[in-house]
Amino acid sequence: MSENRIRIATRKSPLAMWQAEFVKAELERIHPGIVVELLPMSTKGDVILDTPLAKVGGKGLFVKELEVAMLEDQADIAVHSMKDVPVDFPEGLGLEVICEREDPRDAFVSNIYKSISELPLGATVGTSSLRRQCQLRASRPDLIIKDLRGNVGTRLAKLDNGEYDAIILAAAGLIRLKLSERIASFISAEESLPANGQGAVGIECRTNDERVKALLAPLEHLETRYRVIAERAMNTRLEGGCQVPIGAFAEIDGDEMTLRGLVGNPDGSEIIEGVITGPKTEATQLGVALAEELLSKGAKSILDAVYAKA
């Protein structure tokens, strides 16, 4: 492999392509003269669009094909939305860089209403996320929640066609695709705790590829890494995939980190919450400790029931 060339495996969706183009531009800015190629490909999660994600099953629905490309030396790196990245990596691959986080909140999108509280009784809301569903149902049990799949453009088109009164999307994706004007309101973390890693972009590569690791190093954002590592550690201890009713959100103030976590029954009947504060340098330990607290409050029975239905 030329010292001056790097190949990026990416999903084909507009948001995934934005993320890959962002990393490409950063590499070109930091390393003038470098040649960066994009290798768009489809993943299982992109192909199976007629089934709720929780029922498709498995971890890594949106990353496996990209990982195979790296292991077979067809690509050097893969760029991921961190909330799609499984907790375990195939032997020989690892998460090398976590880039600076975009807004991690959920966004309320509607052509008629300004916020969840404005929705009339029995309104129809679209979201494919069990995490969002359980929090919505807990606060508004009257709402009709329908599954919503496809890329951002497809989801917005379904809203515009009148299939839903409102939909819930990650704010980061809309901001990155220059669709901020579609956001009727941002949903606070208190109202809808985000998914672990939401809004962050991660870069995976071969663990023994020192050339690529050196090229990627300047893209690392340490504060984002601390936050995402804590959130992922909690998720790992809970044995959660990317399609489970788990929320995790870390914030940093100076050297202190506050991590909030949530496990909920998708029907909204029970939500178990916890919060922990400690040194940001102990991100992994904080995540594990919070998971243990949630498990001690009964989170395992909720998650076991979800996995049994999937």
Curated annotation (Swiss-Prot):
Its EC number is 2.5.1.61. Keywords: Porphyrin biosynthesis, Transferase. It catalyses: 4 porphobilinogen + H2O = hydroxymethylbilane + 4 NH4(+). The keyword Transferase applies. One of its GO terms (cellular component) is cytoplasm. One of its GO terms (biological process) is protoporphyrinogen IX biosynthetic process. Pfam families: Porphobil_deam (PF01379), Porphobil_deamC (PF03900). Its cofactor is dipyrromethane. It comes from the Bacteria. Belongs to the HMBS family. NCBIfam families: hemC (TIGR00212). This is Porphobilinogen deaminase. The gene is hemC.
